[in-house]
Amino acid sequence: MCLLIKKLYLTFARSTSIIITLVIIDQLSKWWFIDNLRWTPGLMLKVTSFLNMVYTWNYGISFGLMREYYQYSNAIFLITNTLIVCYLYYLMIRSNTIGSFAGYSFVIGGAVGNLIDRCFRGAVFDFIHFHYHNYSFPVFNLADCFITIGVIILIEDYDNTKKVIEEKIKGNYDNAQIEAMAEKIRNTDQGGNDKV
């Protein structure tokens, strides 16, 4: 029991420090660009031929979707995002691999960064804008980058874990061991977080 409490404490301490670090980086970047871009002509700073820093507020969800429903949806976004962050934190504490732990930390850090914006500013501040000729990618921020990186890590971790389980099954195991491993794969495929 004491070992379980120690593991939970270490997981909580590590995850919280990673999440807080990511939130601080996100909020400092937003603060700096809000403070400096508002005085830039056209609210835009050209960095390269394909990258601009722009001053824009996102009242919708990712990439500005549903922004026309802002007056009805901000409270719903706040509640939904908070519940999702809590659920992801629960999954992270249950995670058994470094990859899933890191992936959840990045997703939660990014989600909390955007949640802070929505809670205290009423919208999410976006400032990174990639474009090339007539193509223009939606404006985003570092929190969005953290979420994307976290999802990529989680997908890679899932694939690697599944490969390890499949390799173990190919070995010389008795039927009970094979059935136990297959059950873990089924649980993982159904959205569980069990890993071998």
UniProtKB/Swiss-Prot annotation:
This is Lipoprotein signal peptidase. Its EC number is 3.4.23.36. The keyword Cell membrane applies. It is found in: Cell inner membrane. It catalyses: Release of signal peptides from bacterial membrane prolipoproteins. Hydrolyzes -Xaa-Yaa-Zaa-|-(S,diacylglyceryl)Cys-, in which Xaa is hydrophobic (preferably Leu), and Yaa (Ala or Ser) and Zaa (Gly or Ala) have small, neutral side chains. The chain crosses the membrane at residues 17-37, 73-93, 96-116, 135-155. One of its GO terms (cellular component) is plasma membrane. It is a multi-pass membrane protein. GO terms for biological process: proteolysis. Pathway: Protein modification; lipoprotein biosynthesis (signal peptide cleavage). Keywords: Aspartyl protease, Cell inner membrane, Cell membrane, Hydrolase, Membrane, Protease, Transmembrane, Transmembrane helix. NCBIfam families: lspA. One of its GO terms (molecular function) is aspartic-type endopeptidase activity. It comes from Rickettsia akari (strain Hartford). This protein specifically catalyzes the removal of signal peptides from prolipoproteins. Belongs to the peptidase A8 family. The active site is at residues 126, 144.
